[in-house]
């Protein structure tokens, strides 16, 4: 997966928007105003891309033990977020599943009113 594929995959999800809330380097994808995926554009340029994704604590610990490329979230809650390195032992299919899971967790955390508004749009 390259940066363009990541970009298109994330934006293909319902109500997803892109932002640069921290600096011009950190691309953040949000649903309902809440982050579900972050990545550094400079790291993509250097050839060492990674994503920060939300996950369930029990799965995060299991993934970290199972995959060398999955670690506790960098600059994030180490319990609720993971950092996934690209170009390693995580397949593109698995990466998409992790992104989908992150999106789903954040979407479910939105208020019912906001979820209803998103569903109607």
Where are these regions (language model features)?
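Charge-dense, helix-prone N-terminal extensions
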Residues: 1-121
């Amino acid at each position: 997966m390259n940066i363009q594929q990541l970009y298109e995959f994330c934006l293909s999800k319902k109500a997803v928007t892109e932002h640069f809330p921290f600096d011009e380097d950190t691309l953040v994808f949000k649903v309902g105003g809440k982050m579900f995926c972050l990545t550094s554009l400079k790291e993509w340029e250097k050839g060492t891309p990674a994503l920060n994704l939300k996950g369930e604590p029990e799965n995060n610990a299991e993934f970290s033990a199972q995959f060398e490329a999955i670690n506790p979230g960098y600059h994030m809650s180490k319990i609720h977020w993971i950092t996934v390195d690209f170009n390693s032992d995580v397949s593109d299919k698995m990466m998409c599943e992790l992104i989908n899971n992150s999106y789903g967790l954040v979407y479910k955390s939105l208020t019912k009113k906001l979820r209803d508004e998103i569903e109607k749009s």
